[in-house]
């Protein structure tokens, strides 16, 4: 066993050795909790400060949750004893929690594309219960106590989602993942290449995930924009993706994740601004689509470009800008005039811009844009 799974087993042995007063078993169990706190190219903490489980699969949440739960719990037990977590491992834990894990959380909710198959479980994006991890870190890593206190305040909603959030941009070169953080919003991009696995559907969970890893994006201000939306989503229209509108969503041949087929996926960052590029290529006969896509990250805008879209699919190919909960009205440009749309389904001819929930979508070229604002229904268990 590795990573989070190993930690769960070791916790059992810690309790058992304490009850039986077996010091040798206790030391072995604690070592098994702390030993995964190293950078690796296998499952576990990656050199880019991301986290992998089930092979080369991004799992900042989900299995990332589990290893943080176990490690912070045992580290708090061992504080001040001969088993105390050493300085180097504390630094790794601190860096991952402050600069990756909690940066993917906006307000109370985590980005949907870093939790793996957990996205198909009700309520799993909400990370309020992880205040326990941050609370433990105040004692384990007192040098960053103020940061953990701010994290706790945001998670408890005693402070707004932008409270003490500072600007940052990170491209996780191991995980094929870009995260852009501003006090006003978060924006991320998840890719899949021949180096990284696509999101899994093991245990018959997350059965509609096929396009999830193909350049999907989150844009969040409060963090509630996608919370529990997934039963009513159109999974052919995952935000950021370019995909044929197939009648039935395909499934990868292996439930626990398969490597992507794109050979070009990457990004650059100076820690504040960045760019990400992706030569999307899916050779599945049901899809057989490719596109060149890129994202450029600034303070108040993200520029998303697409070119060279080719497909042999018999279905129309759509690029989805966003698919989130409807909030208030939608304001659109119609021939230079502003118009507020009623609920319904629209085909807009060459709108210059669309405004929804304080986010403006600008279309520099004259394009046909499909827009829906309506009630949708669905179920969790047919996912």
Question: What does each model-identified segment do?
Answer:
Residues 1-121:
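Aromatic-lined, polymer-binding surfaces characteristic
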Residues 67, 74-383:
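Extended polysaccharide-engagement surfaces of secreted carbohydrate-active enzymes
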